[in-house]
Amino acid sequence: MRKYFKERDVPFIIFLMGPTASGKTSVVIELKKQKLGIKIISVDSALVYKNMNIGTAKPSVDELEIAPHQLIDIRDPADCYSVSDFYHDAILEINKIIRSGYVPVLVGGTMLYFKTLLTGLYQLPGKSQNIRNDLIYEAQKIGWVNMYNKLKCIDPIVSKTIHCNDHKRIIRALEVFLSSGKTLTELKQKFLNQQSQRYKVLQFALMPSKREFLYNRIEQRFYKMLKSGFEDEVRLLFSRPDLHDGYQSSISCVGYRQMWEYLSGNVEYDQMIYKGIYATRRLVKNQLTWLKKWPNVHWLNGDNVLIAVNDMLSVLSKYSCVI
């Protein structure tokens, strides 16, 4: 018997976040086995690329058969894929899933993507060269310290996020106010109010009990990728002339960048392994830093998949879920 989610005036979406190698794919596979009325959207800046399967730990063919993921294999490695691209693609998929009567589950570890889904990409007034010129002239007369103090008076909240020496952002914040009559804070709050009315977001995050446990898993996974043909996968990419101009975000992905250095002759094989594992650990540290500051999260056991799934189902049952 399939489990459905009750309809609401504001539709549900679910976030399943977690650091690299925390078991997110395993959890979402088990969720799908529960016959919930859900569909999966990947929130991963590396999984969007085709022909990059091993180094990204992309879900296997069998796993995708159980739990198909949207936004996987949608770009060639030579293509750029920005936060804005993800936001628009994800909103499109979210709305399609909701219209089909299912609940979107967004799973991944690219925390900036998740943040953008919560805050949105709000439109700011266009640049006015006349206003900018006037502001720059004023700054030359009264000094940047006084320009920063002026911003503090106009928009104290935004001024706290801008360094007093960041002249470009000071000018932009003042320009927005002079051209629109609204501060950046006011414009953002108006947009967030509109965003909050679109979806009810339930947020879950996998958190390992010990970081060392996760680091050991990372090391084991990196060696497993090497045995599975990671070097050959990157060699195929390396053979493409269009991937050598240094601008592709795909080749900057953790693991790929280090293997690329090895194939370029810049590091030895053992150095590549060390740097790959180290870079992955730094990525995980960054992800955990994001998560520890993340508001309104239901924390899940990161050491046991079944416990995590049961805890998640328990929370969902309180909000929306019936058999």
Curated annotation (Swiss-Prot):
HAMAP family (alphabetical): IPP_trans
Region (Interaction with substrate tRNA): 44-47
Cofactor(s) needed: Mg(2+)
Record-listed E.C. numbers: 2.5.1.75
InterPro entries: Dimethylallyltransferase (IPR039657), IPT (IPR018022), P-loop_NTPase (IPR027417)
Protein name per the record: tRNA dimethylallyltransferase
Keywords, alphabetical: ATP-binding, Magnesium, Nucleotide-binding, Transferase, tRNA processing
GO molecular function annotation: ATP binding; tRNA dimethylallyltransferase activity
Record site: Interaction with substrate tRNA: 110, 132
Example of a GO biological process term: tRNA modification
Keyword rRNA-binding set for record: no
Family of this protein: Belongs to the IPP transferase family.
Organism encoding this protein: Blochmanniella floridana
Complex formation: Monomer.
Binding site for substrate: 20-25
Function summary: Catalyzes the transfer of a dimethylallyl group onto the adenine at position 37 in tRNAs that read codons beginning with uridine, leading to the formation of N6-(dimethylallyl)adenosine (i(6)A).
Catalytic activity: adenosine(37) in tRNA + dimethylallyl diphosphate = N(6)-dimethylallyladenosine(37) in tRNA + diphosphate
